[in-house]
Each structure stands twice: as structure tokens, then as C-alpha cells.
Amino acid sequence: MNDSNKLYDLAQCFIPGGVNSPVRAFQGVDGKPFFVEKAGGAYLYDVDGRAYIDYVGSWGPMILGHRHPVICDALTKAIENGISFGAPTEIEVKMAQLLTQLMPSMDMVRMVNSGTEATMSAIRLARGFTKRDKIIKFEGCYHGHSDCLLVKAGSGALTLGQADSPGVPKDFAQHTLICTYNDLSSVRKNLEDYPKEVAAIIVEPVAGNMNCILPSENFLPGLRQLCDEFGALLIMDEVMTGFRVALGGAQEYYNIKPDLTCLGKIIGGGMPVAAFGGRKEVMSILAPLGPVYQAETLSGHPLGMAAGFACLTELARPGLHKKLTELTTLLVLNLKKAAQEHNIPLIINHLGGMFGFFFTDAKTVTCYEDVKKCNIERFKRFFYFMLKEGIYFAPSAFEAGFMSLAHGVEEIEKTISSARRCFAQSRF
């Protein structure tokens, strides 16, 4: 038995399922997880001494690569002043200023510690502002694990076959209306069925929690128009897409201005940091200015602010997102070519530094129902072949992949070479 298996057995004695987030348990690929000892650049190293080219990137935050010197230096300097104060600091003001500069739709911003807290707080704020109770979300989209959002959710809930979670009262769930991603008619129907009851539409502008689903040309503009027509707020969950598909997120790329934006992952540079922000008119009813309450002990944590400010400052350097897109495109085009050479039906959606695999004979994959029809067993075989070759993709057919700026041509060429060997197998 290797050290990873020993640690997993021990972990299951003290941690439910042996992991602190369900998708890490490898249940989506019917296996056991490896345990990480360290990381650097584009690589993870497990406790058994194996190295992996990492296309998971801590589920998105590590856009600069692991152990980037800019972030490490910022953390080292920050910790010399103390760990946590529970009082305002200059670095959180600088961080807020930077966020509002990079995301022009955000006049004001409130720092929190996780994407779940960001979306939960944004929805409470939207309800308080509009004095309405219902929200619209999309089947297969994941916005964290707060009760009202664990209805037809994506990410780990899909991996475990639990699109809804026990423990969510029906009284909560009844205020969450479900629509089909990329289908504006389903949105209009719900808005017409519940006039003046919908507080907000929350959407992943690129749906990264049912793999990687891109919005159709009219989808996001259509949502903006419908929100304006029916008096609802548009909340963009850019926890995953923020600073990854473009410096200003998907809202910059698609030229859409939401009322509220939720951020996470990259903004902490690997530390647990998230935020929500938007129009001053809406944000001004948040406590202590207004009646909508939100508070946390560790929000604006000085170490997280230092790491996040360093990460975003580095990302703002000219040319980095162009490079990230070029690296992702190089990987995607060559993986598609390798699949075609062996008559493997494979769709790869991608934008900026994120991508997703769909083993399917379909021409397009545009919504949750399309994702469910893909060949999950083929994905599992692909995942394990690549893992044995030292290539780590997300251990679930419902999770997006992530490129980092630490990846280079060498890592991509090794990935393509391994994929060709995988696709050449007769049993694949």
C-alpha cells in the first residue's frame, strides 16, 4: 500500500469521506485520491514522490502557477506584521480599489472568505434591495453550498449524482426557480409566471461547474435585457471566470454589465478570499450603511489581502492573458487533433485559461442535459491513463480544467503525447 492510500484510509476515520470537499474523493472517477506533499510551477508532487502536470490548479486559483515568488514574497512580508487583527487595514482598502478598477461594474466591494459566502450575501442583498424573495438560477450551475442554491446544482453535487441536497427545507427551495442554461425562453416564462417576485438572476457567465459550457451569442445580453424589463438584478458569479477568461472577467469579454458580481479563487492568490460588489445604489444598503446584514470574523484578512493584491497586480501586466489564451488554445487544438487521428469523438470548449472535455458524438454541448449525455466511462478511462502518465486533470467529467501561466510548451507537448497514446488504445 502506498502512502496516499494509507493517508486516505486514516483520513476516513476522522474526516467524512476522507476529504474536506467531496470532489477531491475521486468518486467521480471511481477511485481513490492521491495526497499532495508540495507543488511548484505547473507541477504537483504527491507523498509517494510522483510528479504531475497540474491542470486543476487548486480548482482555479493558481493562475500564476504554484509557489509563485510574487505571492510568496507578499505573504512573507505580511506575516511579519501579524496574522489577523479584526480591524481595518490599508491593504484591504488597496485591494478594494484595485478590484473596482479591474471590474468597472463594481462601484463598491465587500470582502468575504469563500465563493459560497459571496453568492449567499449577494442574493440576500438583492432580495433586500428589490424587496422580493425569488431567484432564478440555471440547472447544472453551482454557486456554492448555501441552502437556496443547492437546487439543481453543478460541481460536486453532479459528480455525486445529487443535484439537490437533503437538509434544504422545501420552504427555502420554493423560492429558487430553475431555468435551462442558454435558453432565454425558459427565463422569460419564469419571470412572467412570477411577476414582481424575482429578486435576481444569478448566472455563471461561463458555466464551469458542469464542465465548461460557453454562453450562446444572445444569452448574456438577453439576461441583462430581461432583468431590466422585469425589475430583477443580474448577478454574475465570476468566482471561476473572474480574471481568468480576461483581466476584467467574462463581463469584460462579453461586454455585459451586471448589477452585482461575485468573485473568488484567483483574487486570493491561493488564500481563502472572495468578494461581492456592484452598483453603489445596491451596495449602500449593506450594513453598516443600510439594513441588509453581513459580517465575518476573518473577512479582509491581511494575509489573504496581501496575496490577492500581489496576484492581481501581477496579472494586470500587459500580455499575460494573451499568453494564457495562447497556451490553452495550443493544448485544445492539439488534443482535438489527437482525438480525430484515432476517430475519438471529442468536443473541447475553452475560453481564456479554462477548458472542458466532452466525449460525445453530439455537435455541440450547450446545457446540463447535453452534458449528462456524454460518455462518462470514456472520460474515466482517459483520466486514469493520463494520471498514470503524470498528467492531472479534474477527477470529474463535470469540472472545468485550468491552464496556468507556469505551463509551457514542454508541459503541453508531454500532455499531447500522452493523450495520443491513450487514444490509440483499442479499448478506449
UniProtKB/Swiss-Prot annotation:
GO terms for biological process: protoporphyrinogen IX biosynthetic process. Pathway: Porphyrin-containing compound metabolism; protoporphyrin-IX biosynthesis; 5-aminolevulinate from L-glutamyl-tRNA(Glu): step 2/2. The modification N6-(pyridoxal phosphate)lysine is found at residue 265. GO terms for molecular function: glutamate-1-semialdehyde 2,1-aminomutase activity; pyridoxal phosphate binding; transaminase activity. It comes from the Bacteria. It catalyses: (S)-4-amino-5-oxopentanoate = 5-aminolevulinate. It is an enzyme of class 5 (isomerase). Its EC number is 5.4.3.8. Its cofactor is pyridoxal 5'-phosphate. It is found in: Cytoplasm. CDD domains: OAT_like. The keyword Metal-binding does not apply. GO terms for cellular component: cytoplasm. Keywords: Cytoplasm, Isomerase, Porphyrin biosynthesis, Pyridoxal phosphate. Homodimer. Belongs to the class-III pyridoxal-phosphate-dependent aminotransferase family. HemL subfamily. This is Glutamate-1-semialdehyde 2,1-aminomutase.
